[in-house]
Amino acid sequence: PIRSSAASDVYKRQVVFGAADTFRAAAIDQLQVWAAKVKADIIKSEINSDPASVAFKTAEFAKKNEIDVALIDTAGRLQNKKNLMEEYKKIINVLKKIDESFPNEVILVLDATTGQNALNQVKEFSKIHNLTGLIITKLDSTAKGGVVLAICKKYNLPIVAIGMGEKEDDLQPF
């Protein structure tokens, strides 16, 4: 299987992570662990700092250093949380200040146990910026992920990866 470190090991691409989930200290710590595992740079800030600032610094670092892939991890958000959706909009806007073509991809991570609410999530996220793909997680649980087919068809979105656990090798290309 292709591991999460595929970008740096297999494809010989440079990767930088942006720890833009600044609300949970554990999120920053987890991303640091993953960055070390996959030999990626990481841009981070203090807890409760502005997530859009971290996203900006990450994209700026990637562009300046000719990094192939910048992955910006944001706080988990539901489409009915207005302040988090506004933050998502702000992140998109600050990325465009660096380069109008940014972000090149926006991949929404959906929990397979979410059910029909996933349709609403995709709809609301798509209003802010076009999504380019989905990652479906928790397919190792009892979830069947049936709504995913409806989402893919309605929004013409590919599934780029599926999560079958929490280990390094459990995120599989699809």
Question: Which residues make up each language-model segment?
Answer:
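Redox-cofactor binding/interface segments in oxidoreductases and associated redox assembly factors
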Residues: 72, 108, 136
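Active-site/ligand-binding-proximal alpha/beta "capping" segment
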Residues: 91-93, 118-135
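Single conserved hydrophobic/aromatic residue that forms the stacking wall/gate
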Residues: 1-7, 11
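Nucleotide-state-sensitive switch-loop elements of NTP-binding domains
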Residues: 9-105, 129, 146, 151-174
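Glycine- and other small-residue-rich loops at beta-strand/loop junctions that grip anionic moieties
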Residues: 20, 47, 110-111, 140
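P-loop NTPase motor core
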Residues: 82-86, 108-117, 123-124
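Residues immediately C-terminal
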Residues: 77, 115, 141
